[in-house]
């Protein structure tokens, strides 16, 4: 994966492996009497996570594994969407400065203290361009300067950085030994989390063992909390059918399964978590028909987005209300209603005919599922009926990235269906939806929306609810010009057998093994 693609991974979540925050669902079993002592817990991800060093990866599977061995400065409560203590017991924020007051009792798995200076060293390591961390800018601002005084970590930036408290607060942090030898973390761990990595078998599994002395976990979890497993095994299981089989046989305690295999799991408890399951991104590269707003609006008018949602989600999802799909998100707003062009096939046909030249579309789409292929065929049919010529170009998630975001020829695609951006932070979008176009920058769709750029500049200096209102206004400009279209959200389910979770994601201190 090249550097641009690695940076983009911060916005992508492979849905079968998804472990984003969600509600309590039906997965909660009441009472500590039902929890096992020193049990084992096995869960599945859909692909090898690669390098496990949390400072050098944006891959979601690596971050899921990292949640067992590494902690973050703050914990975003899934129920309230508010920050709660984790490594830090207090904090302050302004547009250009955040501080975190660390708990004095934090220790690494080997018993050494974890200090504010160690936290500062983590952030400065990411900022150092020599380390080429994909966490730079996607999480930690390039102009960030981190320092420590006593147990207080201070991070400053030269220009406003919205939601910096949350972004930096969500970075998994490593201990000093790991900072001095980063390569040792590629297949190992050195963190403050409740588990330490024992063994990594590439392409197969990762085994972890519970540490002693862990007392600062979210929801008051400790090393001695009933139900906290002694051993955790992450199994790499690409096939949803195989994941379902392993759940039913008891060889897995937790896994996300979607599609037809869910019918076999009806007797198991589950917890839902929403994710963007459908999005249309138009390529604005000069010379392409979709560089013109009139064409983008017409193509959008040609599609019944309600019908497309039913196809994409198998009837289980709903229309997306904004670009924010992860729960809990930093903001909650509806930028779609009243801003996207409404369904009008006749108007779409008239608009495309008015272009006066052929409208040739190469639609890159996700063909890894039946619903994805059916959705692409539906979209192609509507566009062809309106007068466009459509070429379908399907592949899996990695193929879609290679043809769009990491494409050697940025003009080689016209639109995508299946490149689903996943985030709960609106401030991460400008680096991908504005600025220098690929290959010079990360603006992979060559979007140049001046109203969006002005609105982003206004939103950048705000915090709290005011910031959310400003970011909503910025996002509306993307909808009115049909730059990209959030289509559908699906509640993907994490199924459990012999275990449960206090909340999703199921990392570290959230899991409980049942008797």
Which ranges hold each PLM region?
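Long beta-strand-rich cores associated with HINT superfamily self-processing modules
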Residues: 12, 494-515
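N-terminal lobe/hinge region of extracytoplasmic solute-binding protein
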Residues: 44-95, 190
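Surface-exposed binding/hinge segments that line
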Residues: 97-99, 135-179, 194, 198-201
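Gly/Pro-rich hinge or "lid" segments in bacterial periplasmic/extracellular proteins
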Residues: 168-227, 231
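Ligand-site clamp/hinge motif
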Residues: 214-264
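Structural transition elements
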Residues: 318-354, 369-372
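Extracytoplasmic/peripheral linker and loop segments enriched in polar/acidic and small residues
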Residues: 391-394, 398-400, 429-498
């Amino acid at each position: 994966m090249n550097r641009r693609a690695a940076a983009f991974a911060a916005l992508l979540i492979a849905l079968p492996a998804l472990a984003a925050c969600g509600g309590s669902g039906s997965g909660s079993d009441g009472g500590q009497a039902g929890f096992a002592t020193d049990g084992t817990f096995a869960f599945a991800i859909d692909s090898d996570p690669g390098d496990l060093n949390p400072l050098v990866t944006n891959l979601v599977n690596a971050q899921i594994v990292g949640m067992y061995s590494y902690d973050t400065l703050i914990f975003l409560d899934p129920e309230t969407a508010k920050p709660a203590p984790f490594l830090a017991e207090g904090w302050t924020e302004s547009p250009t400065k955040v501080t975190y007051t660390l708990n004095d009792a934090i220790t690494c798995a080997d018993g050494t203290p974890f200090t504010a200076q160690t936290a500062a060293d983590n952030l400065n390591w990411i900022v150092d361009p020599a380390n080429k961390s994909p966490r730079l800018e996607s999480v930690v601002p390039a102009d960030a300067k981190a320092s420590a005084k006593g147990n207080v970590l201070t991070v400053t930036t030269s220009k406003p950085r919205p939601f910096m408290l949350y972004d930096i607060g969500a970075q998994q942090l490593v201990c000093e030994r790991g900072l001095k030898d980063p390569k040792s973390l590629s297949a190992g761990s050195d963190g403050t989390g409740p588990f330490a990595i024992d063994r990594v078998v590439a392409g197969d599994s990762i085994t972890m063992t519970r540490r002693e002395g862990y007392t600062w976990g979210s929801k008051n979890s400790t090393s001695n909390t009933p139900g906290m497993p002694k051993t955790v095994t992450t199994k790499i299981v690409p096939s949803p059918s195989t994941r379902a089989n392993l759940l039913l046989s008891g060889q897995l305690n937790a896994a996300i399964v979607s599609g037809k295999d869910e019918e076999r799991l009806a007797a198991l408890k589950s917890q839902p978590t929403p994710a963007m399951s459908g999005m249309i991104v138009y390529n604005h590269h000069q010379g392409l028909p979709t560089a013109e707003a009139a064409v983008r609006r017409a193509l959008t008018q040609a599609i019944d987005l309600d019908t497309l949602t039913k196809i994409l989600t198998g009837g289980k999802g709903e229309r997306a209300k904004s670009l924010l799909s992860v729960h809990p998100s930093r903001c909650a707003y509806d930028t779609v209603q009243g801003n996207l062009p409404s369904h009008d096939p006749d108007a779409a046909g008239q608009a495309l005919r008015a272009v006066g030249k052929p409208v040739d579309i190469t639609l890159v789409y996700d063909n890894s599922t039946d619903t994805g292929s059916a959705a692409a065929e539906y979209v192609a049919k509507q566009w062809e009926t309106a007068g466009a010529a459509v070429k379908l170009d399907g592949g899996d998630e990695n193929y879609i990235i290679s043809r769009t975001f990491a494409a050697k020829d940025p003009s080689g695609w016209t639109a995508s269906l299946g490149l689903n951006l996943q985030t709960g932070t609106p401030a991460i979008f400008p680096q991908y939806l504005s600025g220098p176009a690929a290959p010079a920058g990360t603006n992979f769709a060559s979007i140049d929306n001046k109203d969006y750029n002005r609105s982003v500049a206004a939103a950048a200096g705000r915090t709290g609810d005011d910031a959310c209102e400003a970011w909503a206004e910025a996002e509306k400009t993307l909808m009115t010009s049909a730059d990209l279209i959030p289509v559908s959200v699906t509640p993907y389910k994490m199924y459990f057998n012999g275990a449960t979770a206090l909340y999703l994601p199921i990392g570290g201190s959230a899991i409980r093994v049942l008797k």
